[in-house]
Amino acid sequence: MAALSIHHFRQAKQAGQPLVALTAADYATAQILDQAGIDLILVGDSLAMTHLGYTSTLPLTLEQMLHHAQAVRRGVERAFLVADLPFLTYQVHKEQALLSAGRLMKEAGVNGVKLEGGYPDMVETVAFLVQRGIPVLGHIGLTPQAKHQLGGYRQQGKTTPEAERLRQEALSLEQAGAFALVLEHMPAELAAQISAQVGIPTLGIGAGPACDGQILVTHDLLGLSERLPPFAKAYTNLRQAIREAVEAFADDVRQKVFPPR
């Protein structure tokens, strides 16, 4: 099966075909998602919380991201693979962003990178990367790396000035060359307006049904997270299933029925 290219995303938007994106941070999960036909797999900095036990995405380093992205790459044949640039690996200056993104593409084999924010300096950075051959997935609305400045994981764009700022950020990121945008935790009406205004696809996460596609953290979808964000949906409860399987194994061992005699 042919690997998806950057052109797939604009073509999907033009055809009205919803895009599906999920996160992965290990080989097995990546392989399963890829075989299920997911369009985009994101090695998200959320792995700092889901896989490494941190309370936010901020502690994640570029070396840790490289380690996980390399594992994911080995499991992906078809999906378009994007990795987050961790906090403070791209905000200092655009040359820093180029070095970080370049390492992820060169050493981990990702197809593109995701950057948070749409303020002027970040738009300039996006353009700088795109001009040098690096596909960029933009991310506006709730940007978790800025949680302290935002006052927590709060919905963004609820006021008229905030909504207008996000609309302008979306247009600016499109003009800078981003191939798609993540719209996170914003009013559905605003996300619908942005999705209609830009020519590139939008991937919603807590942004209503009018986006061109949806993205979720796979741990949330599988019921592995201890707490679900208000906009997520668990399609199964693997946390409970895993615990029950482990307890059943432990019981068999303690009762000396496994392995069978």
UniProtKB/Swiss-Prot annotation:
Enzyme class: transferase
Annotated 3-methyl-2-oxobutanoate binding sites: D45, S46, D84, K114
Binding-site residues, Mg(2+): D45, D84, E116
Co-factor binding details: Binds 1 Mg(2+) ion per subunit.
Gene3D superfamilies for this protein: Phosphoenolpyruvate-binding domains
Stretches assigned to coiled coil: none
Entry EC no(s): 2.1.2.11
GO cellular component: cytoplasm
Needed cofactors: Mg(2+)
Primary residence: cytoplasm
Pfam families: Pantoate_transf
Keywords of the record: Cytoplasm, Magnesium, Metal-binding, Pantothenate biosynthesis, Transferase
Functional pathway: Cofactor biosynthesis; (R)-pantothenate biosynthesis; (R)-pantoate from 3-methyl-2-oxobutanoate: step 1/2
Top-level division of the source organism's lineage: Bacteria
Residues of the active site: E184 (proton acceptor)
GO MF assignments: 3-methyl-2-oxobutanoate hydroxymethyltransferase activity; magnesium ion binding
Ranges annotated as spanning the membrane: none
GO biological process: pantothenate biosynthetic process
Subcellular location: Cytoplasm
Reaction(s) this enzyme catalyzes, per UniProt: 3-methyl-2-oxobutanoate + (6R)-5,10-methylene-5,6,7,8-tetrahydrofolate + H2O = 2-dehydropantoate + (6S)-5,6,7,8-tetrahydrofolate
Family: Belongs to the PanB family.
NCBIfam families: panB, PRK00311.1
Function, as annotated: Catalyzes the reversible reaction in which hydroxymethyl group from 5,10-methylenetetrahydrofolate is transferred onto alpha-ketoisovalerate to form ketopantoate.
Quaternary structure annotation from Swiss-Prot or TrEMBL: Homodecamer; pentamer of dimers.
Entry protein name: 3-methyl-2-oxobutanoate hydroxymethyltransferase
Organism: Synechococcus sp. (strain JA-2-3B'a(2-13))
Gene, per the UniProt record: panB
